[in-house]
């Protein structure tokens, strides 16, 4: 390019400005101009322009250019008429009376110069210039030099990677759009080969559709872009040197993604996801998680995104941006946003400060509604702020919301967590203050979503503090079956509304053993207390603790922390069937009660000092006590039966 | 109102520490470190009073906080934790966390 410019400069310097100077065009320009010339010539009825006599003719010197295609083209460049006259004069068409290829090319280059803000001089065309831009009508995918009456105000951007970015700075008003386009296009790594660029031209007018206020923007660009994917995809040089095929395919897919990004990155909206990208992301999502309406857990997503070879801090930041509700898992729209950000980053785009509106989950769900996403739609609609959305997005959201609201399932965990939090007396007072404090910032949707979750986390802190305090388990003194311990468990059940749900989290549902410190404690407790049950306690603990631990994590969708604070009843019901399977039915379910009570009593005492006992508790205590005594007997009997079986088996094993 | 915010790891090193530039940062570092001693003292207290004391110490901090700081801090901290790319023990480099801390330091200062 520079060589060509230098040669042109030298040639122009050599030959003065009398006639059209010999013009050396870059390859891109060459292709573009020859195409345009061919169109003009073809439109004029001649063959593909190769010889001067075949060229279109324009009546020189007319104030209003003739209806020839060349004149139309020049008018399409949106330069003032006098500039066009200057150009035609300079290029020598007026002199020779027709637009030969040389004149045509010079004229085109002068148009480009004029559009870049340079004066219409021969010297202007010596330097590198962007390709000239012409207003086109959007009849079909091809460039047409339509009549001015048909021009709809769309612009075709012929992308042109040039080193002279400063030329972009001096623009007319109509080129201001390009000013935003070119800096964003330049980082793209694709080589400035003209044919793909030029082929992209007719499709790029779809991009401009989005910029203008015309309707029906989305379908046409998406359709138009699809045929382009193939040639671009084939040219993507994915580094296929990875030994693992999976990784190789992934890397290739990332480079294909880069090409897709090139094709589909709207010059001023690199954060918009196109249809092909969307499909690609959805396929990748499905490869990680078959159910599109469920989540990808954090670790799975981490492994997947680490393959993109971005640095960990960047991936961390991308995660921060895309995981809108900060739950450690990615829904489909969150995943698409994250993937899109990764692709953009790999293509050289700097990461944004905040999640762009086109990547927010609400927008993504609205733009690409699918029936499987009903629950997330409801989730987002319950909390989404319309402030961020553009008017047409709102329209779409409203339509889909009206459509999908009828089918929507029960409120998701955000709403349920709201209910749970309403139970907590200590948190309630802080709630309204928190909500009122949050200003209407762009992150409002995130903060609003975070609010319900924050309440659940607030309980976690106390619980964690308690748990940590209990972590070095001290063997409690032996017979601990007192009223207080039994009462503590019942207090939980009875005072569930008033007792902070931390208790319920701490106290795992009775049938199963509580997590973490509890198995060890329960073992010790059972050893100390119920000698007859000694043999069964450890096994039970071993059985139930994994079962208990599995249950929260297996509950779909996998949000263990939140699930733990579900109403105890529900958790209890969930736990009971699972542990019932592991051991003898009724006895097993009631067996952990004493152990749980003992350890929970210790943990609970601290909280119970703050809770007032009332007479209901006492009545429940007495009832429970009798129940426990009965169950203790049953467990005794079962233990005896098991020991007998063990004795029977023992001689067999010894042999 | 907050002039210094620090997040200390289990191993007593700061995961995140920031103070307003008006004061000497070193002084705040020392203060944070000495506050760890106070917490340790509370935790290591023996007997039944342990839990009560600790709860009073920490528990009051949380539900009845006059400055709505701890909750926000904790929420942001959990957000950082939720990020699968965050390894526990790393310095906290989350931009959202930084923004929140900045807002807290500015808000009542």
From Swiss-Prot, chain B:
Gene3D superfamilies given in the database record: 3.30.450.70
Gene Ontology process terms (BP): endoplasmic reticulum to Golgi vesicle-mediated transport
SUPFAM superfamilies (UniProt xref): SNARE-like (SSF64356)
CDD domains xref list: TRAPPC2L
GO cellular component terms given for this protein: endoplasmic reticulum; Golgi apparatus; perinuclear region of cytoplasm
UniProt keyword terms in alphabetical order: Cytoplasm, Endoplasmic reticulum, ER-Golgi transport, Golgi apparatus, Transport
Subcellular location: Cytoplasm, Perinuclear region; Endoplasmic reticulum; Golgi apparatus
Keyword Lipoprotein listed: no
ATP-binding found in the keyword field: no
Signal peptide: none
Role this protein plays: May play a role in vesicular transport from endoplasmic reticulum to Golgi.
Subunit structure: Component of the multisubunit TRAPP (transport protein particle) complex, which includes at least TRAPPC2, TRAPPC2L, TRAPPC3, TRAPPC3L, TRAPPC4, TRAPPC5, TRAPPC8, TRAPPC9, TRAPPC10, TRAPPC11 and TRAPPC12. Interacts with the heterodimer TRAPPC3-TRAPPC6A.
Name of the molecule in the record: Trafficking protein particle complex subunit 2-like protein
Taxonomic lineage from the root: Eukaryota, Metazoa, Chordata, Craniata, Vertebrata
């Amino acid at each position: 390019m520079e060589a060509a410019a230098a040669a042109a400069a030298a040639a122009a310097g050599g030959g003065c400005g009398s006639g059209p100077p010999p013009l050396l065009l870059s390859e891109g320009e060459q292709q573009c101009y020859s195409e345009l010339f061919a169109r003009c010539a073809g439109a004029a009825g001649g063959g593909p322009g190769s010889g001067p006599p075949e060229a279109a003719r324009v009546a020189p010197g007319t104030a209003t250019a003739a209806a020839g295609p060349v004149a139309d083209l020049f008018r399409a460049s949106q330069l003032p008429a006098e500039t066009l006259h200057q150009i035609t004069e300079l290029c020598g068409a007026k002199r020779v009376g027709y637009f030969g290829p040389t004149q045509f090319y010079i004229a085109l280059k002068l148009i480009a110069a004029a559009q870049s803000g340079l004066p219409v001089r021969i010297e202007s065309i010596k330097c590198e210039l962007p390709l000239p831009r012409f207003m086109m009508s959007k009849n079909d995918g091809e460039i047409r030099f339509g009549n001015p009456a048909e021009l709809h105000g769309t612009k075709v951007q012929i992308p042109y990677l040039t080193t002279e970015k400063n030329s972009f700075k001096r623009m007319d008003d109509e080129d201001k759009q390009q000013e935003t386009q070119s800096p964003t296009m330049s980082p793209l790594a694709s080589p400035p080969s003209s044919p793909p660029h030029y082929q992209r031209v007719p499709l790029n007018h779809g991009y401009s559709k989005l910029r203008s206020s015309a309707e029906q923007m989305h379908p046409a660009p998406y359709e138009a872009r699809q045929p382009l994917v193939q040639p671009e995809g084939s040219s993507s040089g994915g580094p296929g040197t990875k030994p693992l095929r999976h990784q190789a395919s992934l890397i290739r897919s990332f480079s294909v993604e880069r090409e897709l990004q090139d094709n589909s990155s709207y010059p001023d909206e690199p954060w918009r996801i196109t249809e092909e990208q969307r499909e690609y992301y959805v396929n990748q999502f499905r490869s990680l998680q078959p159910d599109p309406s469920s989540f990808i857990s954090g670790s799975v997503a981490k492994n997947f995104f680490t393959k993109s070879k971005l640095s960990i801090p960047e991936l961390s930041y991308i995660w921060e941006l895309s995981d809108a509700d900060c739950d450690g898992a990615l829904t489909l729209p969150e995943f698409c946003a994250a993937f899109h950000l990764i692709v953009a980053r790999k293509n050289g785009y700097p990461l944004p400060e905040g999640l762009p509106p086109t990547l927010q989950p609400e927008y993504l769900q609205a733009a690409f509604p699918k029936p499987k996403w009903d629950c997330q739609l409801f989730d987002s609609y319950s909390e989404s702020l319309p402030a961020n959305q553009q008017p047409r997005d709102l329209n779409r959201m409203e339509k889909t919301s009206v459509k999908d609201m009828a089918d929507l399932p029960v409120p998701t965990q955000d709403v349920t967590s709201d209910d749970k939090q309403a139970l907590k007396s200590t948190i309630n007072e802080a709630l309204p203050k928190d909500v009122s404090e949050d200003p209407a910032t762009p992150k409002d949707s995130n903060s609003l979503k975070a609010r319900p979750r924050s309440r659940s986390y607030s309980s976690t802190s106390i619980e964690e503090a308690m748990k940590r305090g209990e972590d070095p388990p001290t063997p409690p003194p032996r017979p601990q079956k007192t009223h207080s311990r039994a009462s503590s468990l019942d207090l939980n059940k009875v005072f569930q509304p008033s007792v902070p749900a931390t208790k319920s989290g701490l106290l795992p549902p009775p049938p199963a053993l509580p997590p973490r410190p509890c198995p060890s404690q329960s073992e010790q407790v059972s050893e100390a207390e119920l000698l007859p049950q000694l043999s069964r306690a450890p096994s039970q603990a071993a059985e139930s603790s994994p079962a208990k631990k599995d249950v929260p994590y297996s509950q779909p969708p996998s949000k263990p922390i939140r699930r733990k604070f579900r109403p105890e009843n529900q958790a209890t019901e969930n736990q009971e069937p699972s542990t019932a399977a592991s051991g003898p039915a009724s006895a097993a379910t009631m067996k952990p009660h004493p152990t749980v009570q003992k350890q929970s009593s210790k943990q609970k005492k601290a909280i119970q000092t703050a809770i007032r006992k009332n007479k209901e508790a006492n009545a429940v205590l007495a009832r429970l006590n009798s129940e426990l005594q009965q169950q203790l007997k049953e467990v005794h009997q079962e233990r005896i039966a098991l020991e007998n079986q063990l004795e029977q088996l023992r001689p067999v094993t010894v042999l | 109102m907050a002039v210094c915010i620090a997040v200390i790891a289990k191993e007593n090193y700061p995961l995140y520490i920031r103070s307003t530039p008006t004061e000497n940062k070193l002084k705040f570092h020392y203060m944070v470190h000495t506050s760890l001693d106070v917490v340790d003292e509370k935790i290591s207290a023996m007997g039944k009073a342990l839990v009560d004391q600790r709860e009073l110490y920490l528990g009051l901090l949380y539900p009845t906080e006059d400055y709505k700081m701890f909750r926000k801090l904790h929420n942001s901290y959990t957000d950082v934790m939720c990020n699968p790319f965050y390894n526990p023990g790393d310095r906290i480099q989350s931009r959202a966390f930084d923004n929140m801390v900045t807002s807290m330091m500015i808000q009542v200062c």
